[in-house]
């Protein structure tokens, strides 16, 4: 599960920004070129079922999971949990699951929401989905089309 893999065929990708309480979800367009925020869901026991349903409904070919590192690149307490979840997703769903450094994604998500005129009071509820979209867009831009 590295982020150096090359992607040779187009398809829709999903991104997950996994926190301790919530999971932000983003989806790409069907060609895997642009990312958009999709939803924020609680991190709960049936998380796998919810993700599997979305993968099937939107014909997702791969998932990008953000790895929460500190600004200096050090691992956070959540990194191991996120890697385990990514590994389990790959086993259960039978599709590619890649990890990607999510540093600065929340800051970029805040900037995007501000530029789009999203009221401050609404931003907290949407932040994780926007951060997932940032992670996914970075991933898509870094890989060959």
Question: What is the meaning of each model-derived region?
Answer:
Residues 2-16, 20-145:
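Phosphate- and other anionic-substrate recognition elements at nucleic-acid/protein interfaces
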